[in-house]
Regions:
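Substrate-binding/gating loop at the entrance of the active-site cleft, primarily
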Residues: 1-8, 21
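PLP-dependent enzyme catalytic core of the Aspartate aminotransferase-like
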Residues: 207, 219-290
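Conserved active-site segment immediately N-terminal to the catalytic lysine
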Residues: 64, 83-102, 121, 125
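Active-site phosphate-binding strand-loop segment of PLP-dependent enzymes
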Residues: 13-69, 232
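Helix C-cap/helix->beta junction micro-motif
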Residues: 8, 62-63, 175, 207-208, ...
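Conserved core segment of the aminotransferase class I/II
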Residues: 97-99, 106-155
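Conserved PLP-dependent catalytic core of the aminotransferase class-I/II
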Residues: 51, 145-211
Length: 290
């Protein structure tokens, strides 16, 4: 998404993470007749927090802006039919373009955008990234279609996924591991050093047979390196406990800091809104910039 902003060549303004007051300042400063596109994620994959969708849409309507929402980490996992956070929060009909992926909840490869037919036709006609990309093979499309149909009608996976994520957070917190709070399925464990982060991931795999993705700069700012854990509906209590024991062993071997006061399994996990990341407001120079 950010690469698309860069490739467009459009003027851009960066608004502070989830700070809708700052977003309104930038929108108010733009000429009323200037085409504007607000670009944001619905669920932030590194911290697990969620964008204030309704407020963003309110501002878009007030200042004549379009909206582009990245639902890559939400489709299949949120909403009554798995359409994402926008569906869950009742904002799907207020967002102009929704971006999603087939590579996460749906277990395939590829991605998509959804919007009004005239807008999608414009992208088909003018976007070189689409025009010069080979189409997905029919077997992949068939597999993705089957996965989408299943998750549209089955809520078991979504409910179980959330329950498992909550269980992982509770067990890791009880072990005094530095879990970053969130109310989504993303479970970041703070390390704060790139070499230790990579070493922790390597030890987990080599010594315990557990693969956890290390997240280093430039994916996250320097000093906020972390392990990002994403449990599935099929990780049972025994596997969760094994993960906690493995992480405790790795933390001890690397001399990493633990939380001073462990939380128990029943302590509520609250949401923290990260103020580090920022996303662009892209102002189109002309309508045919698509």
């Amino acid at each position: 998404m950010i690469e698309g902003v860069r490739q467009s060549g459009c003027e851009k303004r960066i608004w502070r993470h989830n700070d809708t007051a700052h977003l309104e300042e930038l929108l108010r400063a733009a000429a009323p007749n200037r085409p504007k596109l607000i670009v944001f994620e619905t669920l932030y994959s590194m911290d697990g927090d969620v964008a204030p969708l309704q407020r963003i849409c309110d501002l878009a309507e007030r200042y004549g802006a379009m909206t582009y929402a990245d639902e890559v980490h939400a489709v299949g996992m949120y909403g009554a039919r798995g359409a994402g956070v926008a569906e869950r929060d009742g904002a799907m009909d207020r967002i102009d373009v929704l971006e999603g992926t087939l590579a996460k909840a749906f277990g395939c490869v590829g991605g998509y955008i959804a919007g009004k037919s005239t807008l999608i036709d414009a992208v088909r006609s003018y976007a070189p990234g689409f025009i010069f990309t080979t189409a997905l093979p029919p077997p992949v499309c068939a597999a993705a279609t089957a996965a989408i149909r299943h998750l549209k009608s089955s809520n078991w996976e979504r409910a179980r996924h959330q329950e498992r994520a909550g269980r992982v957070k509770a067990v890791l917190n009880a072990a005094a591991l530095p879990v970053m709070p969130s109310d989504t399925h993303i479970v970041p464990v703070m390390v704060g050093d790139p070499e230790h982060c990579k070493a922790a991931s390597d030890l987990l795999l080599a010594e315990h047979g557990i693969y956890v993705q290390p997240i280093n700069y430039p994916t996250v700012p320097r000093g906020s390196e972390r392990l990002r854990i994403t449990p599935t509906p099929y990780h049972d209590d025994a596997l969760v406990d094994a993960l906690a024991e493995a992480l405790a062993d790795v933390w001890d071997r690397l001399g990493l800091a633990l939380n001073r006061r462990p939380r128990n399994d029943h302590e509520q996990i609250s949401t923290v809104h990260c103020r580090i990341r920022a996303l662009p407001v892209m102002t189109l120079k002309r309508h045919d910039a698509l």
